[in-house]
Amino acid sequence: MDELAAIGPIRYVIAPNKSHHLFFLPFMNASPSAEGFIAAGLELKRPDLQGFAQIPSEAPWGSELQGFFVDGLPILNETVWFHAATGTLILTDLLFCFSRTNRGLTALVSTILGVNGKLGMSRTMKFATKDRRALARSVAPLLTLPVQRVIVAHDQIIDEEPMAKLAEAFAWVR
């Protein structure tokens, strides 16, 4: 928390999807002046979070960090983020990219999921997609952004040819 405080005050704490929420309350407790927002539907999974607002479409941080709700994948209800100043697209579980240098269980699982050595949607997320057209509509705006870097929550950061890799990752849905 000291490293974050050195950057500046924490004004918002976000649970970006229905899977990434375990440290939401500890962060809120450590940042008493911050506002907390949760993914749509997370309050059903975590009744202790019912007092928090859902991530708004018009967010107070929108001038710095633009959010895009991803429809069609209700198991996640993920919002992804674009930081225009750096051209960075930030994703949690919508896409994965595990390094081919990983070994053991990580290499095995990422290979089975189809995300070993490439940016892509895991086979489990493809299977969990409930509305492919809605998902396609949701990701279409992402492919028009001036993305210079893709940060995924699991393993690799994509600095080389991020737009081409995004297009390839979402080709199955178009």
Predicted regions and their residues:
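Short, well-ordered alpha-helical scaffold segments within catalytic/effector domains
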Residues: 1, 21, 132-136
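Active-site HxH/HxHxD metal-binding segment of metal-dependent hydrolases
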Residues: 2-61
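Metal-centered catalytic cores of metalloenzymes
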Residues: 1-2, 34, 95, 174
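Generic serine detector
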Residues: 19, 31-33, 57, 63, ...
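Metallo-beta-lactamase
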Residues: 37-173
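Short His-Asn-centered micro-motif
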Residues: 14-18, 38-40, 70, 84, ...
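Phenylalanine-focused residue identity feature
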Residues: 23-27, 37, 52, 68-69, ...
